């Protein structure tokens, strides 16, 4: 039997290593968590099970003799007088070990849960590993069956994967065109369904007016997007009805950027210091038709971020908060940003850095899943030219144009199918 150990960052990568080296017939003997990932033990070519042992007549004779002697001793013990039996019980009682002290009992009681906890943790890890193994195997089987039974659907799956769309969004889209026989027609219908799934505001937020804040992680492009929106507004409505507000006193030079923008556009700028009431800061701007707020991109664990989000969520202010998402970010980064900033109440999102993005599927999928209207698309550094009001069909067309040129690998497709078997809590991540 050939036994090997494999090391990888996660279970799926480890399974890929096993399949590549030992083939699909390899058996998984065990898995455990190690520094940096997973250790998987796999084997190939199990030896045949050992043949059953032959009967040993001599041993059977000795066993029968021993059994007879035990029966004789038991009968003799039963026939002995009661007094002798009482003395024997006393003798045996003296030989019993002493009862543990209270301190020893307490120590043992505390030790048991610790061992139990360690055992439960080990069992939990083993179960998680088994679940991931099952997911990988099911994904591989399901993908293989789809290619064999429905090659057209498999081709559409590949195209959606090239766009960066996750399995949980691709599956319902493909179900809508499952009965369409022509591949080209099915693809056009699929993109139409995808376009309808992308929500956009009925009215340009700048035309609607009010108080609008841009929130999101550091580096998403909040300040640059705010500058584009401010310039766009001034060109259409003039500078008299616009005011700029900066809540970013943490990043070096952030407020200076807003001040410079205000001077260029001839627009008043209000700086909100930490601890200052946002309600009081906005009170003098009540007559302005449009107020744009730039916020700080702080770590999710920073208490200052919680205070900032609570201020923006105040019902008395009626702030429309838009999540700024860089389309260059990974799916997990986008999901984490949404989970952090959703607490302030999001009116929609703005997608930035489209000119640098490798795909748009991840950001589109988040907007669709969370029902976030996509307000604007920012695709360059020019102010205000590189900011467009979002149109769902244009966004989908751009996503198609950015799809990866190469076909996804079989392992990538199997892994995507494996995601369909994950528990909802794990998919949410």
UniProtKB/Swiss-Prot annotation:
Membrane topology according to the record: Peripheral membrane protein
Residues annotated as binding GTP: 216-223, 294-298, 352-355
Entry keywords, A to Z: Bacterial flagellum biogenesis, Bacterial flagellum protein export, Cell membrane, GTP-binding, Membrane, Nucleotide-binding, Protein transport, Transport
GO cellular component annotations of the record: plasma membrane
GO BP terms: bacterial-type flagellum organization; protein targeting; protein transport; SRP-dependent cotranslational protein targeting to membrane
Subcellular localization, as worded in the UniProt entry: Cell membrane
Gene3D superfamilies: Flagellar FlhF biosynthesis protein, N domain (1.20.120.1380), P-loop containing nucleotide triphosphate hydrolases (3.40.50.300)
InterPro entries with a match to the protein in the record: AAA+_ATPase, FlhF, FlhF__GTPase_dom, P-loop_NTPase, SRP54_GTPase_dom
Pfam families, per database record: SRP54
Primary residence: membrane
GO terms for MF: ATP hydrolysis activity; GTP binding; GTPase activity; signal recognition particle binding
Family: Belongs to the GTP-binding SRP family.
NCBIfam families the record matches: FlhF (TIGR03499)
Function: Necessary for flagellar biosynthesis. May be involved in translocation of the flagellum.
Protein name: Flagellar biosynthesis protein FlhF
Organism: Pseudomonas aeruginosa (strain ATCC 15692 / DSM 22644 / CIP 104116 / JCM 14847 / LMG 12228 / 1C / PRS 101 / PAO1)
Taxonomic lineage from the root: Bacteria, Pseudomonadati, Pseudomonadota, Gammaproteobacteria, Pseudomonadales
Gene (name only): flhF
């Amino acid at each position: 039997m050939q036994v090997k150990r494999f090391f990888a960052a996660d279970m799926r990568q480890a399974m890929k290593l096993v399949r590549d080296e030992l083939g699909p017939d390899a058996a998984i003997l065990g898995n455990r968590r190690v520094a940096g990932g997973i250790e998987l033990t796999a084997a190939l070519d199990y030896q045949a099970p050992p043949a059953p042992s032959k009967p040993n007549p001599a041993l059977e004779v000795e066993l029968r003799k021993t059994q007879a002697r035990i029966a004789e001793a038991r009968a003799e013990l039963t026939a002995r007088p009661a007094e002798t039996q009482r003395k024997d019980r006393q003798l045996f009682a003296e030989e019993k070990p002493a009862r543990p002290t209270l301190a020893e009992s307490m120590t043992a009681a505390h030790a048991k849960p610790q061992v139990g906890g360690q055992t439960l943790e080990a069992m939990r890890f083993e179960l998680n590993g088994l679940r991931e193994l099952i997911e990988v195997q099911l994904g591989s089987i399901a993908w293989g069956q789809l290619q064999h039974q429905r090659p057209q659907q498999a081709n559409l799956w590949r195209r959606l994967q090239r766009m960066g769309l996750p399995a949980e969004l691709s599956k319902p889209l493909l179900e809508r065109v499952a009965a369409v026989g022509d591949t080209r027609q099915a693809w056009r219908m699929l993109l139409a369904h995808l376009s309808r799934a992308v929500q956009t505001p009925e009215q340009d937020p700048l035309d609607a007016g009010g108080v609008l804040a841009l929130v999101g992680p550091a580096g998403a492009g909040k300040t640059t997007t705010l500058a584009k929106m401010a310039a766009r507004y001034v060109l259409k409505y003039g500078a008299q009805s616009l005011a700029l507000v900066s809540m970013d006193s943490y990043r070096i030079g952030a407020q200076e950027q807003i001040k410079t923008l205000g001077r260029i556009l001839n627009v008043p700028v209000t700086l909100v210091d930490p601890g200052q009431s946002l309600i009081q800061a906005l009170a003098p701007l009540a007559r302005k038709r449009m107020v744009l707020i730039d916020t700080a991109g702080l770590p999710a664990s920073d208490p200052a971020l919680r205070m900032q989000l609570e201020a923006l969520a105040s019902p008395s202010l009626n702030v429309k908060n838009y999540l700024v998402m860089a389309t260059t970010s990974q799916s997990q980064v986008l999901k984490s940003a949404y989970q952090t900033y959703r607490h302030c109440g999001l009116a929609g999102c703005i997608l930035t850095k489209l000119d640098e993005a490798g795909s748009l599927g991840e950001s589109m999928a988040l907007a669709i899943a969370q029902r976030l209207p996509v307000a604007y698309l920012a695709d360059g550094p020019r102010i205000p030219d590189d900011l467009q009001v979002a149109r769902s069909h244009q966004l989908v067309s751009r996503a198609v144009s950015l799809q990866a040129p190469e076909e996804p690998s079989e392992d990538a497709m199997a892994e995507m199918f494996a995601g369909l078997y994950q528990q909802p809590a794990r998919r949410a991540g």
